[in-house]
């Protein structure tokens, strides 16, 4: 057991009490009342069945499924003395021995002019998000051109590609639509507030805060139940259709996005996600978990790569702190 000081214990107790006070209405809310609200105001709650082996066979006959994910890691200290590696991976269920990797390396020191020492952290995040989104979209594009799959499942909401990598995203979207390839996004960490926004308008349900969908739907759906959203949302305005799904024994839900032009396949894709997700797992399709594990860039990997291919003098002068030298 860790030896915690009393001040730290007190801070944790304070946070606990603060959060209990904030979420007391939600924790005591009648889930049946919330379900009755969701059906007419948000979308139909529907119980779905996992696909049979016979149903799954059709995906092998029609090109299989491609899973896409990305990863990033960095070595170094404060701006501009750091280096980042981005890696994207697209992997076909039919040709697992032919992974499609894409990679990008970035450091502010590579710029021709002296980098801005006071670089805004918000701008850095925008750049980082774009680099990661670009590399994932590039991997997806390469995979659909090589494998011609039935569907592509991206790890995360596909709206983020429209935001962070608009030009490449439009290329991927257009190519999928032209080739009839279904494009899907699966999100574990839901950040939307679709239900919360509608609840605040409802006079018959007293709720003091605008809770997020992740919070409101915790324990609300049964395993295999999905909510097919039929109200206007930011995702719909971006040309997407969405559903919430409880895909495992865990009481949390995930979100499934699809292009609006392919909305007739939404229920099929939600069922596919349900089928590919272990009932006792973390809620996302096993194939995405496999891709996630293979694309990850560990601390030891980035250090090994830089030690092998970067001049040792540059590595130590630019990217290794005195503290880090103890582990290099």
Segments (PLM) and residue ranges:
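Long, contiguous domain-sized segments
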Residues: 1-58, 63, 117-119, 125-151, ...
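Two-metal-ion RNase H-like nuclease active-site motif
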Residues: 63-73
């Amino acid at each position: 057991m860790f030896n915690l000081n009393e001040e730290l214990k007190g801070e944790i107790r304070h946070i606990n009490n603060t959060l209990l006070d904030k979420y007391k209405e939600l924790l005591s809310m009648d889930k049946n009342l919330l379900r009755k609200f969701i059906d007419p105001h948000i979308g139909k709650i529907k119980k779905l069945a996992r696909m049979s082996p016979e149903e799954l066979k059709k995906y092998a006959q029609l090109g299989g499924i491609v899973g896409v994910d990305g990863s990033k890691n960095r070595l170094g200290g404060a701006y501009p003395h750091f280096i980042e590696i981005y890696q994207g991976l697209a992997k076909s269920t039919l040709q697992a021995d032919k992974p499609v990797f894409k990679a990008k390396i970035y450091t502010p020191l590579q710029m021709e002019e002296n980098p801005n020492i006071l670089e805004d952290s918000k701008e850095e995040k925008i750049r980082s998000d774009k680099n990661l989104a670009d590399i994932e979209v590039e991997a997806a594009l390469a995979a659909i051109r090589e494998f011609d799959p039935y569907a592509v499942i991206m790890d995360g909401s596909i709206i983020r590609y429209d935001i962070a990598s608009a030009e490449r995203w439009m290329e991927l979207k257009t190519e999928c639509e032209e080739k009839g390839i279904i494009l899907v996004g699966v999100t574990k960490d839901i950040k939307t507030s679709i239900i919360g926004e509608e609840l605040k308008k409802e006079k018959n349900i007293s709720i003091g805060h605008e809770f997020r969908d992740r919070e409101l739907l915790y324990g609300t759906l049964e395993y295999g139940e999905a909510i097919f959203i039929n109200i206007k949302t930011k995702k719909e305005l971006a040309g997407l259709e969405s559903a919430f799904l409880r895909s495992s024994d865990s009481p949390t839900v995930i979100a499934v996005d699809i292009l609006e032009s392919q909305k007739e396949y939404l229920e099929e894709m939600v069922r596919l996600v349900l089928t590919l997700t272990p009932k006792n797992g973390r809620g996302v399709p096993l194939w995405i978990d496999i891709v996630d594990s293979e694309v990850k860039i560990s601390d030891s990997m980035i250090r090994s790569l830089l030690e092998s291919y970067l001049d040792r003098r540059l590595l130590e002068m630019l990217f290794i702190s005195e503290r880090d030298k103890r582990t290099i």
